[in-house]
């Protein structure tokens, strides 16, 4: 409690005063025997024929780029609009591209926990806003820290929003960089904080000049592809796809430059969104296409390009790293 009070005392006080909802009874749909049978069936077999090793090193440096709302609606290889994300489309042929990945939620606070802790998003509550729960979750950064990784997180916005700072610190991120670490002009370059071209440039310089001993893990959350979708880029007439095209442009330039640095050789770059985006606004937002998202593994640590069509969920990423990262078993079950 004292740790969370120091991180965000106002939020911790209001959160404690508002504890009145019994989530256990609200979401207990199955008896224990049926739940166990269903849960066991989710685990893949582990025979040799079903496993593909995808990396050429056991302890890569790991960069996770969580792209704001970057859903399949804008990614042509997933059936999305053409010419919105040409850089991502190109990069999808250079790494391990998962074509049947689905988001688990619709908000950044939920999607962040889904991604980094492998914890399902709840429809009526944000686990990130419940410190008593979020601090007990397993997490990618926590597991990697135990394995000797240095960990840090970059976000160009207000890192206290939705209690994000508390969640990130309690789940293993040792250093946080946010909007207040940039100049005032940079902080106000977007309605939500620092525009993506600025944070991508900052990240590039950090990685290019990094001289830490031992492996490291960095996570980066973008923000420009969020309403009101006002960005310093004007390639498409519709401002919504244009905002995603802007983030795609920033991503493409960043990856192309990073390839030319020594950091690329032992690097695993994982690109996925925090959640999808309802566009075009036709039909129900409960349709599967609304949750369809891209997931791409890039970097010098990747053995060879391949496409994985197996259905998976956003939470699978966190579960994979929490269970396997520090023993060097980076594999895909097919």
Residue ranges: model-predicted function:
Residues 36-334:
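Solvent-exposed soluble domains appended to multi-pass membrane proteins
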Residues 1-50:
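Membrane-interface segments at or immediately adjacent to transmembrane helices
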């Amino acid at each position: 409690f004292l740790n969370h009070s120091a991180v965000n005392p106002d939020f911790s006080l209001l959160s404690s005063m508002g504890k009145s909802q019994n989530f256990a009874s609200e979401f207990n749909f199955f008896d224990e025997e049926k739940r166990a049978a269903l849960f066991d069936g989710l685990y893949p077999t582990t025979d040799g024929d079903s496993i593909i090793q995808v990396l050429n090193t056991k302890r890569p440096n790991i960069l996770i780029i969580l792209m704001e709302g970057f859903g399949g609606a804008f990614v042509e290889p997933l059936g999305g609009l053409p010419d919105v994300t040409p850089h991502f489309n190109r990069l999808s042929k250079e790494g391990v591209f998962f074509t049947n990945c689905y988001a688990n939620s619709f908000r950044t606070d939920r999607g962040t926990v889904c991604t980094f802790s492998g914890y399902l998003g709840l429809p009526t509550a944000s686990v990130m806003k419940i410190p008593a729960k979020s601090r007990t979750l397993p997490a990618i950064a926590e597991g990697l820290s135990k394995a000797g990784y240095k960990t840090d997180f970059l976000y160009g916005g207000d890192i206290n929003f939705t209690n994000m700072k508390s969640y990130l610190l309690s789940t293993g991120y040792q250093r946080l960089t946010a909007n207040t670490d940039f100049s005032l002009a940079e902080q106000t370059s977007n309605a939500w904080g620092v525009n993506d071209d600025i944070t991508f440039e900052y990240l590039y310089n950090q990685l290019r000049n990094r001289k830490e001993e031992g492996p490291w893990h960095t996570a980066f959350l973008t923000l420009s592809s969020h309403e009101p979708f006002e960005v310093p880029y004007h390639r498409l007439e519709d401002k919504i796809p244009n905002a995603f095209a802007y983030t795609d442009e920033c991503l493409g330039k960043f990856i192309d430059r990073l390839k030319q640095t020594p950091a690329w050789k032992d690097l695993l770059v994982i690109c996925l969104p925090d959640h999808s985006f309802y566009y075009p606004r036709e039909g129900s937002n409960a349709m599967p296409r609304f949750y369809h998202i891209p997931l791409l593994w890039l970097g010098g640590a990747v053995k060879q390009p391949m496409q994985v069509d197996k259905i998976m969920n956003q939470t699978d990423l966190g579960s994979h790293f929490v269970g396997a990262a520090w023993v060097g078993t980076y594999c895909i079950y097919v």
